[in-house]
Amino acid sequence: MRDTYVLSGARLATMEAEGSYGLVEDGAIAIQGDEILWCGARGALPDTYAACPSTDLNGRLVTPAFIDCHTHIVFGGDRAGEFEMRLEGATYEEVAKAGGGIVSTVTATRAASLDALVTGALPRLDALIAEGVSTVEVKSGYGLDRETELNMLRAARRLAEHRDVTVKTTFLGAHAVPAEYAGRADAYLDEVCLPTLRAAHAEGLVDAVDGFCEGIAFSAAQIAKVFDVAAELGLPVKLHAEQLSHQGGTKLAAERGALSVDHVEYATEADARAMAASGSVAVLLPGAFYTIRETQVPPVAEFRMHGVPMALATDCNPGSSPLTSLLLTLNMGCTLFRLTPEEALAGVTRNAARALGMQDRGRIAPGLRADLAVWDVSRPAELAYRIGFNPLYARVMGGKMEVRT
């Protein structure tokens, strides 16, 4: 068969079945172009593929390629200085008065050119790709003015031109109220955020719409206005909600059929029931939990009880989660949030794809995209168990296999 090859002699974690990794021992995968044609036990490989080129993976583990479904990797500047200040005892208010906090990132991002935003994001993207990532979600939200928000989304789109990766863009104009609109959140939404969303959509820059529903950001009623425009434009929504307190954002997101509700440390059982009914994914972000030394753990037991899918992501951002490792995120999800290793792996594959509304990836099955990761480990749990070690042997992106050097 033309342009078809076979990966064989692998232990496959197909992620097709919950609770067992969907394991296939001594497995094989037939790939044509960017599509998986067949997968299963090597002994059952159809004769159709007998003459195709084959690569023996010698017992290595193959999983779906990783998906980072919540990042802020496009931004200007850094916040290492305020990290030191916080460790020396400075309060949030003191950091802000010294020019730190999100204001410093907004200032640096507004000052950066489009090329500079792309150049700054590439090393962060490269770190993710080096750990088997094939798909990355990238948010705006550090411009908070029309041109910078648009430039952030343009930069995100350009990343896929520089690297072999799929990028999904999210408009996050309702991330914070900029200094020039202090105390006038509604005016900011009406005069800047919503017109910018319309402009970004008209330019083809937006795959989804997000917001930050929190006491320090926007109320549920204000986020509802953003979601109204998203619905008018035919865009799916997601929401940062219940991270620092309970504000009712999860209920709103579920009512609007959100793809995901993210952070959710303060979500309740009622929220879990609402998410289960709407099919929304709970995106857990242990990097931010760790960095800001949070103590309120997401209600994982309630999510399990009600069948809410759970994803994991880096939440890579300069302030609360300067994290560019999904492997470390797996470990954090298990040690901090008590996910099982299987739940963690599902969280960066099957459920991460669901959180982005992508049905063509995140599992190993015929008809799906051939985005795979090949690991020098024998047990899937090792991916979450080991710390500071990258066992990636090769990444298969759209059917093209690149062995890590």
UniProtKB/Swiss-Prot annotation:
<feature type="binding site">
    <location>
        <position position="317"/>
    </location>
    <ligand>
        <name>N-formimidoyl-L-glutamate</name>
    </ligand>
</feature>
<feature type="binding site">
    <location>
        <position position="79"/>
    </location>
    <ligand>
        <name>4-imidazolone-5-propanoate</name>
    </ligand>
</feature>
<protein>
    <recommendedName>
        <fullName>Imidazolonepropionase</fullName>
        <ecNumber>3.5.2.7</ecNumber>
    </recommendedName>
</protein>
<feature type="binding site">
    <location>
        <position position="243"/>
    </location>
    <ligand>
        <name>4-imidazolone-5-propanoate</name>
    </ligand>
</feature>
<dbReference type="GO" id="GO:0008270">
    <property type="term" value="F:zinc ion binding"/>
</dbReference>
<dbReference type="GO" id="GO:0005506">
    <property type="term" value="F:iron ion binding"/>
</dbReference>
<dbReference type="GO" id="GO:0050480">
    <property type="term" value="F:imidazolonepropionase activity"/>
</dbReference>
<keyword id="KW-0479">Metal-binding</keyword>
<dbReference type="InterPro" id="IPR005920">
    <property type="entry name" value="HutI"/>
</dbReference>
<feature type="binding site">
    <location>
        <position position="175"/>
    </location>
    <ligand>
        <name>4-imidazolone-5-propanoate</name>
    </ligand>
</feature>
<feature type="binding site">
    <location>
        <position position="142"/>
    </location>
    <ligand>
        <name>4-imidazolone-5-propanoate</name>
    </ligand>
</feature>
<feature type="binding site">
    <location>
        <position position="315"/>
    </location>
    <ligand>
        <name>Fe(3+)</name>
    </ligand>
</feature>
<comment type="function">
    <text>Catalyzes the hydrolytic cleavage of the carbon-nitrogen bond in imidazolone-5-propanoate to yield N-formimidoyl-L-glutamate. It is the third step in the universal histidine degradation pathway.</text>
</comment>
<keyword id="KW-0369">Histidine metabolism</keyword>
<dbReference type="Pfam" id="PF01979">
    <property type="entry name" value="Amidohydro_1"/>
</dbReference>
<keyword id="KW-0378">Hydrolase</keyword>
<dbReference type="GO" id="GO:0005737">
    <property type="term" value="C:cytoplasm"/>
</dbReference>
<feature type="binding site">
    <location>
        <position position="240"/>
    </location>
    <ligand>
        <name>Zn(2+)</name>
    </ligand>
</feature>
<keyword id="KW-0963">Cytoplasm</keyword>
<feature type="binding site">
    <location>
        <position position="72"/>
    </location>
    <ligand>
        <name>Fe(3+)</name>
    </ligand>
</feature>
<comment type="pathway">
    <text>Amino-acid degradation; L-histidine degradation into L-glutamate; N-formimidoyl-L-glutamate from L-histidine: step 3/3.</text>
</comment>
<feature type="binding site">
    <location>
        <position position="72"/>
    </location>
    <ligand>
        <name>Zn(2+)</name>
    </ligand>
</feature>
<dbReference type="InterPro" id="IPR032466">
    <property type="entry name" value="Metal_Hydrolase"/>
</dbReference>
<feature type="binding site">
    <location>
        <position position="315"/>
    </location>
    <ligand>
        <name>Zn(2+)</name>
    </ligand>
</feature>
<feature type="binding site">
    <location>
        <position position="319"/>
    </location>
    <ligand>
        <name>N-formimidoyl-L-glutamate</name>
    </ligand>
</feature>
<feature type="binding site">
    <location>
        <position position="70"/>
    </location>
    <ligand>
        <name>Fe(3+)</name>
    </ligand>
</feature>
<dbReference type="GO" id="GO:0019557">
    <property type="term" value="P:L-histidine catabolic process to glutamate and formate"/>
</dbReference>
<feature type="binding site">
    <location>
        <position position="70"/>
    </location>
    <ligand>
        <name>Zn(2+)</name>
    </ligand>
</feature>
<dbReference type="InterPro" id="IPR011059">
    <property type="entry name" value="Metal-dep_hydrolase_composite"/>
</dbReference>
<keyword id="KW-0862">Zinc</keyword>
<dbReference type="GO" id="GO:0019556">
    <property type="term" value="P:L-histidine catabolic process to glutamate and formamide"/>
</dbReference>
<feature type="binding site">
    <location>
        <position position="142"/>
    </location>
    <ligand>
        <name>N-formimidoyl-L-glutamate</name>
    </ligand>
</feature>
<feature type="binding site">
    <location>
        <position position="240"/>
    </location>
    <ligand>
        <name>Fe(3+)</name>
    </ligand>
</feature>
<comment type="similarity">
    <text>Belongs to the metallo-dependent hydrolases superfamily. HutI family.</text>
</comment>
<keyword id="KW-0408">Iron</keyword>
<dbReference type="InterPro" id="IPR006680">
    <property type="entry name" value="Amidohydro-rel"/>
</dbReference>
<feature type="binding site">
    <location>
        <position position="320"/>
    </location>
    <ligand>
        <name>4-imidazolone-5-propanoate</name>
    </ligand>
</feature>
